[in-house]
């Protein structure tokens, strides 16, 4: 029987969006690798939990392509992180950005993830909002 990875992946996204951490192992392998480094399920879960400290985080699938062992997805985000985000001083500003991510599956579970976040778009939005702010409201470093 062939597994439909598009359906499995949507289940994974639903698991993330509902923050159902106890069931993350149903979708992610115990020895998962992230961007070429083996981190394991516990570290992967902790990273996702940390991302959800931003209360308006929601994974929105815009593009999804799959075959028998690979999923490619473009995710979109519209969030207002406090403080720094990806090393950038977002400080509560609303930012919209994308992530292009590839997943390799074995036995119906994610075993390898390659992720590229559009950090340049976030930086441009921060710079634009800083330039548009009145001089007396600008935060300096």
Residue positions per predicted region:
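C-terminal and inter-domain tail/linker signature
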Residues: 1-141
């Amino acid at each position: 029987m062939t597994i439909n990875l598009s359906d499995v992946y949507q289940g994974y996204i639903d698991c993330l969006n509902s923050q159902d951490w106890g069931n993350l192992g149903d979708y992610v392998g115990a020895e998962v690798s992230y961007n070429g480094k083996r981190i394991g399920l516990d570290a992967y879960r902790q990273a996702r939990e940390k991302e959800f400290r931003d209360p308006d985080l929601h994974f929105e699938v815009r593009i999804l392509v799959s075959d028998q062992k690979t999923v490619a997805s473009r995710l979109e985000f519209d969030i207002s992180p406090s403080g720094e985000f990806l090393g950038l001083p977002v400080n509560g500003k609303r930012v919209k950005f994308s992530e292009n991510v590839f997943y390799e599956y074995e036995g119906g579970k994610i075993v390898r993830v390659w992720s590229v976040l559009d950090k340049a778009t976030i930086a441009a939005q921060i710079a634009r909002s800083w330039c548009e702010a009145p001089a007396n409201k600008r935060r300096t470093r």
